[in-house]
Amino acid sequence: PNAKLTVLTNSTQLHKRKIADAVALADKGLLKLDTTDPNQFLIINKPAKGLELNTIMQYIELFPGEKIIQTLVLRGESDGKKIDNTTEESLLALAAFVSKIEAIEWMIYPIDRPTPEKQLEKMSREEMDHIGEFVRKHTNVPVTIRY
């Protein structure tokens, strides 16, 4: 059997030993990371108390299998706070991290369906293409843009 096991995770529980051990059995990990900025992380992910972005990033880096990073790009407001992980600064920081961890792929996608946060924008196809062109110039990792 040549089947490969891939696990999809939002990456928030990788710091727990049992979870990390189970996920480590996979050949590939689709690991969610929308930002490298702690303030944006709080707005986008609304994490449980005590869960910190640097911990998530540490454990993404430690994942022993092939890493595929998934990033949801969004812009607008959430709970009255401005959010935009499509800025050059945000994308450059993500590109640097994705390169550093030697991911085999970086999947970037927009909001696909209505969200409880009505002030979040869905990126147009043209905006997604622009994001793809920009990040490809700043990483050696293959980038897949989903529409």
In which residue ranges do the predicted regions lie?
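Short acidic, glycine/proline-enriched helix-loop-strand junctions
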Residues: 117-147
